[in-house]
Amino acid sequence: MLYHGVDLVEVARIRHAVVRYGQRFVQRVYTATEQADCLAGSGDVRYEALAARWAAKEACAKALGIGLRGLGALAVADRPRAGFHEIEVVRDNDGRPVLRLSGFAAEQAAALGICALAVSLSHTDELALASVVAWAG
C-alpha cells in the first residue's frame, strides 16, 4: 500500500516566525542537524530551506495519517502526537533529503507497516513544496 502527503508553504510565513520568535521557534521546530544544514547559508536561502523542511514535516505527518493536528503544540488534546523533532529531514551521502523518524512518528509508521519513505523538496523565493511517499507491505 502507498501513502502520500504533500504540503505547500509560503516562505514568508516561516521568515516571519523566525524574525518574530527567533531561536525559540527554530529550536522548537527543527533538530540541531536541520538547523545546521539550513542556517549554514546566507540571506533568504536560509528561510527557503527552513520552509522546505517545515513542508516535509507536514507532508510526512499527512502520509502517516496524523496531519498537522498531530504535530507539536497544535496536537488535539487526548490524542497521541508527534513532536516536530520526531520527523527530521537529513541528507544522505549524495546530499539528497531523507526522512528520519523517531518517537510517536516512528511508532505510527510501524503501525501502518511502512517500510520505506521518499521525500522530495522544492522551493522558490516565495514557496516551498514537499511530497512524501510511504510504502507499506
Curated annotation (Swiss-Prot):
Enzyme nomenclature, EC number: 2.7.8.7
UniProtKB keywords: Cytoplasm, Fatty acid biosynthesis, Fatty acid metabolism, Lipid biosynthesis, Lipid metabolism, Magnesium, Metal-binding, Transferase
GO biological process, alphabetically ordered: fatty acid biosynthetic process
Reactions listed under catalytic activity: apo-[ACP] + CoA = holo-[ACP] + adenosine 3',5'-bisphosphate + H(+)
Top-tier EC class: transferase
Chief location bin: cytoplasm
Pfam families xrefs: ACPS
Single GO molecular function: magnesium ion binding
Gene3D superfamilies xrefs: 4'-phosphopantetheinyl transferase domain
Family note: Belongs to the P-Pant transferase superfamily. AcpS family.
Protein name according to UniProt: Holo-[acyl-carrier-protein] synthase
Source organism: Chloroflexus aurantiacus (strain ATCC 29366 / DSM 635 / J-10-fl)
Gene name as annotated: acpS
